[in-house]
């Protein structure tokens, strides 16, 4: 069977026409160092025929220089792109790869396993729908396996594929497989996963990755790829209320005025009643404008321009939401932080908080507790160090519109930015929202916003991806 193909034989136009309307699933691979995360992704790319001839030639050359599989091709090198990663044989940065099957398109994030790169792992998990947690069958559950399972839970990923790798090195022992699964289920019981699917596999040999293996006669489940093709994630996302942070006001002439942005959640159609935060003004959607023409309905992930039936004052930083479930306005946030800066975080610290498309001034009012990344237990704390996870209260200089993270991952998350370096210092998840009692603080003018925002903005997702080089 031909695994790779030439660009000419591939057919780009046909590929784009076929795959542009497919459902996209984002997932991450995580686990301890050397559990085989990069090899697994390489195997997925290889066996789904996503590799071109020139890539195969380069892979063979790189395998001779940097490979860890002896004379065999090292599939991990398809993902480990940094020179330091190849020289050390580990993953440091978060590597994103795309592949597609007849059923779905996939965006996979290969996250680092070393503890000092946990902040990078949180970057990859922040946008994922499913987590593939790898476990080396020889070693079982490790400290970093538990840490990553906890991080996955804290970041709101509810479905886990427990990929028990290197089963060929333990003779495909069912007893070993059952022991690892039992241990993980016991640890994960309080983490509120809706599903844990355990799959025995060998990423190096390809058993139970894309195609079913024959060695584990006792396993009657599906391969990993089939699980990823069938897991019903998007149906859960569609239940979220409509939210669209305004990126800019589109006014090419005096006859047209619309609000442009990326729909963060839910869907919208002409005639829907909406509320604009923080002003609280209400209106209805008159048009959904795009470069390809008007739409009858737009959904999560689409970039559109909404034209409202009424003249509503709004600018960058505002959020348009369904009137049936408006956002809460607040100037005080209880957040769970993934602290990434080398300097400690203590009460009184002043940072920028970027929420959606709006940047506000934030002061740490209190550090309440630190979360043990291995047990999930909380303990009292008065500061957070690098890689710590903890609960803090932030005081903001104006009211913003947010949701709790458990209700909406987009409008319930933020990043904290160091004022001096403009580096991303933390990823924050809004825990509880208490409505402000004072009058709404007017949104800053465009010139004020430009003066206050750090030079390196680019949106929440771009900021998250900058999380210490992520």
Curated annotation (Swiss-Prot):
Binding-site list for GTP: 31-38, 110-114, 165-168
UniProt-listed InterPro entries: CysN_GTP-bd, CysN_II, CysN_NoDQ_III, G_TR_CS, GTP-eEF1A_C, P-loop_NTPase, SO4_adenylTrfase_lsu, T_Tr_GTP-bd_dom
GO molecular function: ATP binding; GTP binding; GTPase activity; sulfate adenylyltransferase (ATP) activity
G5: region residues: 202-204
Record domain tr-type G: where: 22-237
BP GO annotations: hydrogen sulfide biosynthetic process; sulfate assimilation
Catalytic activity annotation: sulfate + ATP + H(+) = adenosine 5'-phosphosulfate + diphosphate
Listed pathway(s): Sulfur metabolism; hydrogen sulfide biosynthesis; sulfite from sulfate: step 1/3
Disulphide-bridged cysteine pairs: none
G4: annotated segments: 165-168
Complexes and interactors: Heterodimer composed of CysD, the smaller subunit, and CysN.
PANTHER family xrefs: TRANSLATION FACTOR
NCBIfam families listed in its UniProt record: CysN (TIGR02034), PRK05124.1 (NF003478)
Family of this protein: Belongs to the TRAFAC class translation factor GTPase superfamily. Classic translation factor GTPase family. CysN/NodQ subfamily.
Protein's name according to its UniProt entry: Sulfate adenylyltransferase subunit 1
Species in which this protein is naturally found: Methylorubrum populi (strain ATCC BAA-705 / NCIMB 13946 / BJ001)
Lineage of the organism: Bacteria, Pseudomonadati, Pseudomonadota, Alphaproteobacteria, Hyphomicrobiales
